[in-house]
From Swiss-Prot:
NCBIfam families (UniProt xref): pro_imino_pep_1
Catalytic activity, reaction form: Release of N-terminal proline from a peptide
AB hydrolase-1 domain boundaries: 35-296
Function of the protein: Specifically catalyzes the removal of N-terminal proline residues from peptides.
Family assignment from sequence similarity: Belongs to the peptidase S33 family.
Cellular location(s): Cytoplasm
SUPFAM superfamilies: alpha/beta-Hydrolases (SSF53474)
InterPro entries (alphabetical): AB_hydrolase_1, AB_hydrolase_fold, Peptidase_S33, Pro_iminopeptidase
Protein name: Probable proline iminopeptidase
Keyword Translocase: no
Main localization category: cytoplasm
UniProt-annotated catalytic positions: 110 (nucleophile), 266, 294 (proton donor)
Length: 321
């Protein structure tokens, strides 16, 4: 099993204005002359953490992390205005141009895989390779599975806590019920809903429930952005034109070397989506981790991701891995 690379600090960081309203935090670490890779975090609304730098050999990669609109250190915090998938795709291009990078590798898991696909299908000429994990295509059935009826059969205990802020008469549409509370002007209503929404995902993200992950997801500031922005995207169906847009447009990226890492027992983003993506991208490499759930910190997923980044960085730019 592979282990994380040693912890490193960024060699440069900054705030990049991307609209009159939004400014995003970004950072660079590793080798300034290495192969560039942009890390797209999950959620949406999850933000970046220092550990994400450690999935890449710092002597060979130029590692770019940034907080998407409303998340992490980006401002304004938890802002829903001017916050859509296509705003984020535009921000990625603005960041690439700001850093004078012609083409780069794209790494993303969960919602980060959604955004990676949306970005690469919009700008395929800018992508050298894709490393995707815990595939989320933001189709209606995926949303219903996790937030309405499906994952609840596997985690009925945690599901009860998720239900608590919503009265029984509103539970036929949990996304809408949560959205009303997460956009409430009442801070207490908003906070209660944000924590319940966020902790539900934190509880279900690993094959073996991790209490430390639950406490992270219960943090007030994290939960506020995470829950509000997620629910905003999901009630708007990801701002996609069709339910399976990301699968329909796979022909645009069929030539891009792609690795898909998927936990067999991922409850948050079930393997059916990774399987559908792999079939739509038959040249992709699908790695199924047999003893893992959703989290990129689970040993088998972590090992497969680091192995993939090592293989990518060792190959010539246009070569398959």
């Amino acid at each position: 099993m592979r282990q994380l690379y040693p912890a490193i600090a960024p060699y440069q960081s900054g705030m990049l204005p991307v609209s009159a309203l939004h400014t995003i935090y970004y950072e660079q670490s590793g080798n300034p002359n290495g192969k560039p890779v942009v890390f797209l975090h999950g959620g949406p609304g999850g933000g970046t953490i220092p550990t994400y730098r450690q999935y890449f050999d710092p002597s060979k990669w130029r590692i770019i992390l940034f907080d998407q609109r409303g998340a992490g250190k980006s401002t304004p915090h938890a802002e829903l205005r001017e916050n859509t998938t296509w705003d984020l795709v535009s921000d990625i291009e603005k960041l690439r141009s700001h850093l004078n990078i012609d083409r780069w590798f794209v790494f993303g898991g969960s919602w980060g895989s959604t955004l990676s696909l949306a970005y690469s299908q919009t700008h395929p000429d800018r992508c050298l390779g894709l490393i995707l994990r815990g595939i989320f295509l933001l189709r209606r059935k995926e949303i219903l599975w996790f937030y309405q009826d499906g994952a609840s059969w596997i985690f009925p205990d945690a599901w009860e806590h998720y239900l608590e802020p919503i009265p029984p008469e509103e539970r036929d549409d949990m996304i809408s019920a949560y959205y009303r509370r997460l956009t409430s002007k009442d801070a207490e209503i908003r906070s209660t809903a944000a924590k319940a929404w966020s902790v539900w995902e934190g509880t279900t993200s690993r094959l073996i429930v991790d209490p430390s992950l639950q406490s992270k997801f219960a943090d007030d500031e994290f939960a506020d952005a995470f829950a509000r922005i997620e629910c905003h995207y999901f009630i708007n169906r990801g701002f996609f034109e069709t339910d399976d847009q990301l699968l329909q447009n796979c022909d645009r990226i069929a030539h891009i070397p792609t690795v898909i890492v998927q936990g067999r027992y991922d409850v948050v983003c079930p393997m059916t989506s990774a399987w559908a993506l792999h079939k739509a991208l038959p040249e992709s490499e699908l790695i199924v981790v047999p003893d893992a759930g959703h989290s990129m910190m689970e040993a088998g997923i972590l090992s497969a991701l680091i192995d993939a980044t090592d293989r990518f960085v060792a190959q010539k730019t246009n070569g398959k891995i």
